[in-house]
């Protein structure tokens, strides 16, 4: 107590101190300045950017842990039209679009939720029930409150095939001939029952089949001569005493396996049903004009099967029509048995059947060669021993098929049998093993370190990492296999960037499986995305021409290879520090060929989507040209057309209205207007190709890459 006081420890000041990061806040702009890159990505406006969406018709079922049971209600929607549903878009936080979040969103307010029919909520998720006129089965929709300016295929699937197509009182609603631009396109119907972004995480959430009052869905062609005259009828219906099936698998025919132009019958074609009770709750009707006896399901529905232990597992099948006399059509294996080619099969031609996965095929008709994807890896430090010849690539589909089912055709369905075996499922382990065949062995962490997250997208996160030996920075895109809406699209990230190299395409070094994540190592472009420039600065016509020239060179190369990017926008254009422009984000691309000349899946980002994509018409490489035209408007006006409107409403405007225009036409030269008019043509066959646009006089205004550098300096000062 009275001892000698201890000497106070002296702490010296920092030595060799230097300010490397100078942060501040601009009160006029109300923005932070000088933030480090990883901080800026968290505070930037990119969170408000619309996310791309995919067609849910080919979502792959996998085995997942069950979520707690969601109880449904019987409320019906207040309004029948799509407008009543679009009102809620402005009230939803865009942060809910994050596909990598670890928790469920908070429970939405009851006022907004009451606009959606036949649902109740729990932890922010809404469960829907629709009653099909072709099937006395209850189909459960586990959905999440939709997000502002973030639209996925789940949303638009229901946007097309929704339960809101008629008034609450069940009166039929007809589309008039003048309601849409294309006389042959399908009407858009709005059901905004949104699936959560972590779609597979919630597919298996219902632990038992429930019996509730549902809605009877009557979809039929009207007797009018106009191809747009449909009648939609919803009538309340209860089936007391009728046993619901608790084991069922849903089959879709919204495939892109061939040039089928049946615009009216491209509906859910069949259901493969397992009954737990002896009474079959199934009706069949003959589709007009086809004589096909088949049950129907609402498109995009998730059919659940009850596991004996109470866990629910879902199963999907994706056959195409080939046997008009069967209740479940047989897959055309002449088309389905393809060498596993991810750009072709990974996007929207990945057929599945109730008892068999696709087999390998020896020929695929590409533009110049069979493109069986030899193991190409850039000769660099990133090179690791990998599969080098096409013969070493085992067909992923046949590999997965060999793990489960050996039969080559679909057996006839037994609607009343409770002992039928359940359709085969692709487990996570099987899918991971298939993906392992096309990536390189090894762990990139052996030669990379200092991982810093700089961005986040709908499929994964992006980090920068440093090569240990050279100090070179690379970008690493990390995608969790268990958190994808469509796992097959992950193959695009690997194969397209690996096999197609161009000066204006982001270079991929290698890809790996690290645990349950796909890691794609690619070049790091320090200049960031074009979005930063168009948002914070204004571009002159020389700079616009420079960007267009580089993007058109990349598109011309890809289109000649039969590759459709399907997500052209400023977010997909990256810049180097010296102003060079490169195309990136190939996760939503598709391959076309002589055998598969058109696509029909709903893929893209709403504001940039071409009218034919929204209208569900068969499309080709022309959709990228339309999206590029929208991106030109984005470079002129700072945002795409209709950007102040909710995604669905903007899509309806794109579908029904004349091509969008620049806000201030008087500020645009006649040469640029003419260039834009060649891209924003509603009729795809009249739209200019990338090669044709490369010869346009406007592109002669293009300057060197250095003319873009001042723009990067400007937005960094904001």
Curated annotation (Swiss-Prot):
Disulfide bonds: none annotated. GO terms for biological process: apoptotic process; cellular response to starvation; cytoskeleton organization; intracellular signal transduction; learning; locomotory behavior; memory; negative regulation of extrinsic apoptotic signaling pathway. GO terms for molecular function: ATP binding; protein serine kinase activity; protein serine/threonine kinase activity. GO terms for cellular component: cytoplasm; mitochondrion; nucleus; synapse. Residues 359-371 have a biased composition (Low complexity). Residues 25-447 are annotated as: Linker. It is an enzyme of class 2 (transferase). Autophosphorylated when activated by CDC42/p21. The modification Phosphothreonine is found at residue 107. Residues 11-24 form the CRIB domain. Residues 1-29, 96-119, 226-245, 264-296, 339-371 are annotated as: Disordered. Pfam families: PBD, Pkinase. An autoinhibitory domain is present in the N-terminal region of the protein. This is Serine/threonine-protein kinase PAK 5.
